[in-house]
Design a protein with these regions (language model features):
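Conserved SAM-binding loop
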Residues: 11-104, 128, 221-224
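Conserved alpha-helix/loop element of class I SAM-dependent methyltransferases that forms part
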Residues: 1-10
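Short, flexible hinge/linker loops that cap or flank conserved catalytic cores
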Residues: 7, 25, 213-214
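S-adenosyl-L-methionine-dependent methyltransferase catalytic module, highlighting the catalytic core
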Residues: 74-85, 89, 93-226
Length: 226
């Protein structure tokens, strides 16, 4: 696919750095993957996302980007999000999913400024950094759904009709307890955790204790152009 073919789509849904996550894959219906190494023919287009996207202003309805922004520099993140604002129609939404290095398990990597597990993570994204970047942009409003702040895990209900995020407790298979043994084990550990604390435990406390079995937990935020 080339950009002329993208332009005739109505509506236009873009998945930035999307690899093979595009139409007709479940959760990515209507989405065109924009990637430096597109997976093949069909609903994908080649583009270096550090450069301007060759589409007119106010031409895109929905933009999605998961696990891409951490691979570019902070200045490049700002420039790309500003480019997305230009592209979005009034009423358009951009959904972002990035690693959240503010969680207790991965905070030591944020403190040292690098993550040797993932050397290709150029920017160690986190709630404080992403909020600062977003608040400097002209989006009319934003909503964080899934993030760590001051040692607390915030998890609001995510409407996936606005865009798929794979690496969340809802969708990542590592977070699922499918067998009876797993369910009993989780229930027993939860009970003992509550018992030892006199049952003065919130669901948020349980969520923090369990963790999400992910290498790095996700930060999810929507940006709105009203």
């Amino acid at each position: 696919m080339n950009w002329s073919e993208v332009l005739i789509k109505d509506p236009i849904y873009l998945n930035l750095g999307g690899s093979n996550n595009c139409h007709p894959k479940v959760g990515y219906e209507k989405y065109i993957s924009v990637d430096i190494n597109p997976p093949g023919e069909g609903w994908s287009v080649k583009q270096d996302l550090r450069k301007p996207i060759p589409l007119p202003d106010n031409s895109v309805t929905r933009i999605l980007s998961e696990d891409f922004l951490e691979h570019i520099k902070v200045e490049e993140i700002k420039a790309l999000l500003l480019e997305c604002f230009r592209l979005l129609k009034p009423g358009g939404i951009m959904r972002i999913g990035v690693p959240d290095y503010n969680n207790p398990k991965d905070y030591p990597y944020l403190k040292r400024g690098s993550d040797p597990r993932f050397p290709h993570h150029i920017t160690l994204t986190n709630y404080k950094l992403m909020r600062k970047i977003i608040e400097e942009l002209p989006f009319s409003r934003h909503e964080f759904y899934h993030y760590w702040d001051n040692g607390k895990f915030i998890c609001k209900k995510i409407d996936y009709s606005f865009g798929m995020i794979r690496r969340t407790p809802d969708n990542d298979p590592r977070c699922r307890t499918t067998s009876l043994k797993q369910k009993v084990d989780v229930a027993l550990k939860d009970f003992m955790y509550k018992l030892l604390r006199g049952f003065r435990v919130s669901e948020e406390d349980l969520s923090v204790r369990r963790g999400h079995r992910l290498h790095v937990t996700s930060l999810v935020v929507d940006l709105f152009k009203d």
